[in-house]
């Protein structure tokens, strides 16, 4: 199943710079492994925001929930998920 996911990150000032850097490093490794596996085929930054739009290609809701809740930045994220379906006018 395909999902459009919007993620906004808000790391509170109570998190030290060192801890934030560590979390971001873990996040990068985690997300790149998912990209290499094909489960996270598209990732775009939102200009001027600490946010992204992503496409996930996973088995279903439970798989996506497991992936998203495993993100090291998950505790600091607001996430919106939209399931996608093929459009009848699409030529692909």
Question: Which residues does each PLM region occupy?
Answer:
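Conserved, structured core segments of small domains
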Residues: 1-92
């Amino acid at each position: 199943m395909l999902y459009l996911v919007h993620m906004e990150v808000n790391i509170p000032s109570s998190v030290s710079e060192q801890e934030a850097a560590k979390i971001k490093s873990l996040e990068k490794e985690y997300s790149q492994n998912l990209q290499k596996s094909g489960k996270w085929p598209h990732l775009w930054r939102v200009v001027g925001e600490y946010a992204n739009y992503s496409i996930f290609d996973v088995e279903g809701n439970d798989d996506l929930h497991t992936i998203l809740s495993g993100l090291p930045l998950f505790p600091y994220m607001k996430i919106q998920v939209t399931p996608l379906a093929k459009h009848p006018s699409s030529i692909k």
